[in-house]
Amino acid sequence: MQAGLSLVCLVLLCSALGEAVLKKPKKQAGTTDTKTDQEPAPIKTKGLKTLDRGWGESIEWVQTYEEGLAKARENNKPLMVIHHLEDCPYSIALKKAFVADRMAQKLAQEDFIMLNLVHPVADENQSPDGHYVPRVIFIDPSLTVRSDLKGRYGNKMYAYDADDIPELITNMKKAKSFLKTEL
């Protein structure tokens, strides 16, 4: 009986000592730990969401529709709003095609205020013919929705699919060129 009790006490003692060894010592007031003071904690980036949402890291994206309208007016550039859903296969395909096309990326970087939205906006001008995705709407610096710049579908005027990148680029160029002739 005494041997069993001694064994239990020994196991508990070893367990307590093991925990004490593995614990980090507490800092005393007035002392500094040079390692933790100099090295910031690592930043976890896995799963981090950015404003580009995969549409182009080198493009400057605005966060909200209101911010986009203000910047369009302030910078005298058209606002291009991409409405999409992250789990929609058509949105994913358009995103991949848009990212892969150098001209689309260049125009977006240099000539547009860019916004991509995964939720509807209160402005009904953003959905004149429905709330489908993906759809791309152009707004000029006078804050007018460009209803003349649309995709090739009659029933979903602002829809584009992955094969429509040339049409989208044409509309981007038109949106940009109208600035020179209209304003």
Curated annotation (Swiss-Prot):
CDD domains: AGR (cd02960)
Disulfide topology: none
InterPro entries on file: AGR/TXD, Thioredoxin-like_sf
Organism: Xenopus laevis
Name of the protein: Anterior gradient protein 1
Record flagged with keyword Secreted: yes
GO CC field: endoplasmic reticulum; extracellular region
Summary of the function given for this chain in its UniProt record: Does not appear to be required for cement gland formation.
Keywords: Secreted, Signal
Gene name per UniProt: ag1
Subcellular localization, as worded in the UniProt entry: Secreted
